Design a protein with these regions (language model features):
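Active-site-proximal alpha-helix that buttresses catalytic centers in soluble enzyme cores
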Residues: 2-87, 111, 125, 129-131, ...
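Generic beta-sheet signal
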Residues: 3, 98-106
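Glycine-rich phosphate-binding loop signature in dinucleotide/nucleotide-binding domains
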Residues: 44-47, 95-100
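Residue-level signal for well-ordered alpha-helical positions
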Residues: 65, 117-118, 140
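Short, hinge-like loop/turn segments at secondary-structure boundaries
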Residues: 69-70, 93-96, 122
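Conserved ATP-dependent adenylate/AMP-binding module captured primarily in the ANL superfamily
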Residues: 89-91
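Flexible, glycine-rich active-site loops centered on histidine and acidic residues
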Residues: 108-109, 116-127
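Domain-level recognition of soluble alpha/beta enzyme cores
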Residues: 122-148, 154-158
Length: 161
């Protein structure tokens, strides 16, 4: 499996009065910058077989922008991508065949923890994703360990592709 891990784009700050964390939207700047980054993603990765997203608003908005860059791709919500454990996330991903390319959009710290687990490192020895950043991992078999990092890019680089 090829797994494309994307952190949601820039959202309104946590603690904004009247907006619960799960309802924080992308900022106009976040939307604009991620539209550019998504074009770069589409150049690096052919249209995935599936695009999964956390049900939280900022992740869904990020997934919708990514889907538009690939064309004809409908994001599917997966609750485990909001706050689930690695086992819950792995169960969602195990629904896809080993030759699939799956993109997931989620939040820190789980995107970094997921990447660390896929690469077989300690969960606290992680690469931290910038908002709108992405990583591509080739996963040869089981999801825990053994993955090969193809690339790990911040949004600034994705926007320049």
């Amino acid at each position: 499996m090829q797994l494309l891990i994307i952190r949601h784009a820039i959202a309104v700050p946590r603690g904004t009065p009247g907006i619960p964390d799960e309802d924080r939207p992308l900022t106009p700047e976040g939307e604009q910058k991620f539209r550019e980054a998504a074009k770069g993603l589409a150049k690096l990765v052919d249209r995935p077989d599936a695009l999964l997203t956390s049900p939280w608003l900022r992740a869904k908005q990020t997934a919708t922008i990514a889907a538009a860059a690939w064309g004809r791709l409908e994001p599917k919500e997966a609750a485990a991508l909001a706050s689930g454990s690695f086992d819950d996330q792995a169960a969602v991903l195990d629904e896809y065949p080993g030759d699939a390319t799956v993109a997931v959009v989620g939040h820190e710290p789980w995107v970094s923890e997921l990447l660390a687990r896929l690469l077989g490192t300690r969960h606290d020895a992680r690469l931290e994703f910038k908002k709108g950043g992405a990583a591509l991992v080739d996963v040869p078999g089981r999801l825990a360990g053994g993955g090969q990092l193809a690339w790990f890019l911040p949004p600034k680089v994705l926007r320049k592709l």
